[in-house]
A protein has these predicted regions:
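N-terminal leader/targeting and pre-domain segments
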Residues: 20-63
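Conserved redox-active cysteine motifs that mediate thiol-disulfide chemistry
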Residues: 73-82
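Thiol-based oxidoreductase modules, predominantly thioredoxin-like and allied folds used
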Residues: 71, 97-111
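Short active-site neighborhood of thiol/selenol oxidoreductases, capturing the structured segment around
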Residues: 64-74
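Bacterial Sec-dependent N-terminal signal peptides
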Residues: 1-24
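Non-catalytic, surface beta->alpha helical segment in thiol-disulfide oxidoreductase systems
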Residues: 123, 129-159
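Short helix-capping segments at alpha-helix termini
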Residues: 92-96
Length: 159
């Protein structure tokens, strides 16, 4: 009888562990996510957004007709640092949210619409800048110099 109790408690313990792992994995944002939802559900992103002070501001005209795809992982420390910085800078420049596409990726760097594969994402975060549906540049994982300098390098050379 004691072995039955031991097996029963072992089963309950194992089941509770697997259930909590599933919940943790499923709590990540995968696919399209709004800025509001990101900040409401992931406090670290909101805190990093509030703490970041953009450097030398860029001319908002540089962003004319630019679509920005932000492919990131909630689970990624680089994403937790860089995504809020980009969003703060874009907000400071009054870039409309409909030009900003936040796409949460899983650990395999993909999501249900396969945009991780489409954009050939190897590292997160990756910021992809498109004009007329053609890629004009990207920032992978973190800026080379600074966010502002890298954006000026990418967008400043466009007509």
């Amino acid at each position: 009888m004691q072995k039955i109790y031991q097996l029963f408690f072992l089963y309950l313990f194992t089941y509770s562990l697997s259930a909590s792992e599933t919940y943790a994995i499923n709590s990540y944002a995968i696919g399209d996510i709004s800025i509001k939802t990101l900040f409401e559900n992931h406090e670290g992103f909101q805190n990093n957004y509030e703490e970041y002070q953009p450097g030398e501001l860029l001319d908002p005209v540089l962003f004319h007709d630019i679509e920005i795809y932000v492919l990131f992982g909630i689970w990624c420390h680089d994403s937790q640092r860089e995504v809020p910085r980009l969003l703060r800078l874009l907000n400071t420049l009054n870039i409309q949210e409909n030009y900003i596409h936040l796409i949460g990726l899983n650990f395999s760097k993909n999501e249900p619409q396969d945009r991780g594969k489409h954009f050939q994402i190897k590292r997160t975060p990756t910021f992809v800048f498109l004009r007329n549906q053609k890629e004009v540049g990207r920032i992978i994982e973190m800026p080379e110099i600074s966010l502002e300098a890298d954006l000026l390098k990418i967008l400043g050379s466009l007509d």
